């Protein structure tokens, strides 16, 4: 209720879920001193997003849907008031805007979060990718000296940095647009402001759970993360 369940055009589904608010990432080695609080005090891995209101309006060429939610985690002591606006056009395009306001409802509030952004699930068949942003390899806010702004091509699997111990990886900073799928059949996303991008064939939960790369369970969709902010590597 109050979530985008599917986005398809010409009979083909491109998105099967999302966007939804997200503050969690699979922990990295340098998160070892924060992990206990993140997981067992602030419960960032257990999000809850409650729909508060929905309004929609039909026009000649589009439908506009406005959704208000409250995003938090299990303890409900902190969270975000979220305003989603979807403009869905008859030509097969969709514009999405999300505004969030931080809210404290109790005494427990994390000093900082690993990420603030949205997550979406896309069609598994969309494995090719192109983006305009930092590349070609991964980059983070405190680790991007070797990255250069440009247009890059890859595959979803190749976006992964294969660490010996599975952890958060493959992030690209300052992305202005990206495409998954090829030029004739794909999903093109353009951002008003530069955002952080992760594309993966696995969820953060499966990455967190795995002890070795071969134990990472593949997802049934391409997982898309778009981050307003993503914490550094430390």
Language model features: what each stretch is:
Residues 1-234:
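Beta-strand/loop-rich accessory regions of lumenal/periplasmic or secreted enzymes
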């Amino acid at each position: 209720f109050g979530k985008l369940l599917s986005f398809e055009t010409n009979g083909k589904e491109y998105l099967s879920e999302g966007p939804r608010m997200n503050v969690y990432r699979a922990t990295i080695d340098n998160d070892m001193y924060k992990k206990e609080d993140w997981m067992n005090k602030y419960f960032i891995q257990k999000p809850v997003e409650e729909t508060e209101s929905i309004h929609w309006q039909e026009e000649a060429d589009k439908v506009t849907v406005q959704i208000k939610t409250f995003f938090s985690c299990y303890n409900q002591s902190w969270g975000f008031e979220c305003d989603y606006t979807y403009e869905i056009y008859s030509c097969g395009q969709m514009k999405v805007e999300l505004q969030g306001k931080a809210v404290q409802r109790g005494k427990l509030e994390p000093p900082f979060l690993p990420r603030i952004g949205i997550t979406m699930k896309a069609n598994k068949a969309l494995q090719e990718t192109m983006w305009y942003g930092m590349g070609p390899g991964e980059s983070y806010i405190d680790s991007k000296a070797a990255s250069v702004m440009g247009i890059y091509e890859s595959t979803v699997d190749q976006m992964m940095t294969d660490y010996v111990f599975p952890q958060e990886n493959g992030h690209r900073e300052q992305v202005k647009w990206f495409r998954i799928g090829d030029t004739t059949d794909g999903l093109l996303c353009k951002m008003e402001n530069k955002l952080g991008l992760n594309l993966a064939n696995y969820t953060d939960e499966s990455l967190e759970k795995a002890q070795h790369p071969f134990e990472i369970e593949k997802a049934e969709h391409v997982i898309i993360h778009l981050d307003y902010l993503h914490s550094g590597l430390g």
